[in-house]
Regions:
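Active-site hotspot residues in diverse enzymes, especially metal/ion-binding acidic/histidine motifs
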Residues: 1-274
Length: 274
């Protein structure tokens, strides 16, 4: 688990980390203001792309391979972001924020790698294996966006959080407030110098079973560990089908057949994997 520290931009390149922090501050000033984003990240993402005059499609559905968290690609002038809804909600949120950084680079820094080859986010990159600089930057951007310094200070005061003897339950409280994964919460506390490196390493050595047990016992951050199988979205497909229905643009038999097929697909995806 300590690879999270070793592979963090904060440890690898402090100067670049500060630059990313400035980017997040600028982004929030325009697209988010003072809100704690949580699961509104999907709306923030959509708003950002559409305000740059590019059609946007958000795809959220369960994929059997939970190692694949998200991907982004551009086809025929339209941007697609797919988020795997078979992973915990906090990880979906972080994945969306991670992908937002790649999109940010495309629009603000004219980095056209996204157009050429797209972006694929695997679970290990979020957890502890971010080896490429851009992935380290994207992880830093995501964590800073979801748990910005000012809001972290504010909420620490609201909940009277003390960081002198930080426990796993204190980290769970940060997770609950900001909807971030455990490792990201620990890293943010370390980055803001709420905890030292020794404490960070100790917290990161806590096993996943123990973390899950404490979430279950306390109820803290439990809502963000859920896998909401009812959330299935195929971009603007449903809206376009509705428009066709209103305009009578296709034969009724064809439309009913397509609607039945879509319903069948959705119901199949909502069934728990065996």
């Amino acid at each position: 688990m300590c690879k999270v520290l070793d592979n963090s931009l904060y440890r690898k390149d402090r100067k670049r980390y500060k630059k990313i922090s400035e980017c997040v501050t600028g982004f929030n000033a325009i697209y988010n203001k003072n809100n704690i984003i949580q699961d509104d990240i999907f709306n923030v993402l959509e708003n950002y792309v559409t305000r740059h005059d590019m059609p946007f499609e958000l795809l959220r559905y369960p994929i059997g391979d939970t190692e694949l968290c998200a991907c982004t690609f551009i086809r025929q002038g339209r941007m697609f972001v797919m988020v795997n809804s078979a992973i915990p909600l906090s990880k979906q949120i972080f994945a969306a924020a991670h992908e937002l950084y790649h999109i940010y680079c495309y629009f603000e820094e004219k980095d056209f790698v996204l157009m050429q080859s797209g972006s694929i986010l695997e679970s290990d990159v979020i957890d502890d294996e971010a080896k490429e600089l851009e992935d380290m930057e994207a992880n830093a951007f995501a964590a800073l966006l979801l748990a910005p310094r000012d809001r972290l200070e504010e909420q620490s005061a609201v909940y009277n959080l003390s960081y002198k003897n930080v426990s796993v339950q204190d980290v769970l409280k940060i997770m609950d407030i900001f909807a971030v994964p455990y490792k990201a919460a620990v890293l943010r506390l370390f980055e803001e110098e709420k905890i030292d490196i020794k404490t960070a390493k100790k917290l990161l050595q806590t096993g996943n079973d123990e973390i899950c047990k404490q979430i279950e016992v306390t109820g803290k951050a439990e809502r963000w560990q859920e896998i909401p199988r009812e959330i299935i979205r195929f971009g603007s497909l449903s809206e376009k089908m509705y428009e066709l229905e209103q305009w009578e643009g296709v034969r009724e038999e064809r439309l009913e057949s397509d609607k039945a097929r879509l319903k069948e697909i959705v119901e199949k995806l909502r069934k728990p994997a065996r």
